[in-house]
Amino acid sequence: MPVAPSNHCDNQCPHIFSKALVVSVAPSPPRDKPAPYTFTDVSSLCGLQKKCEGGKAMLFTLKRDRFSFLLFVSHC
């Protein structure tokens, strides 16, 4: 499996993104995607801004299109 360049994706353990739950969407959720949102494409999550990290839970912010997603990753 090829390794993605780390200059734009500073992610130590990409497998945590196999399932990431969106706990907050701003300004409003996309109408074509029912909650809860899940992201399974790891490459699309490159460039996440890590908000906090403690124990085995992390919060990330992801900006895509016009929306700002708050992702909760439960394990690493």
Swiss-Prot record:
Name this polypeptide is given: Ovarian cancer-related protein 1
GN (gene name): OCR1
Recorded superkingdom: Eukaryota
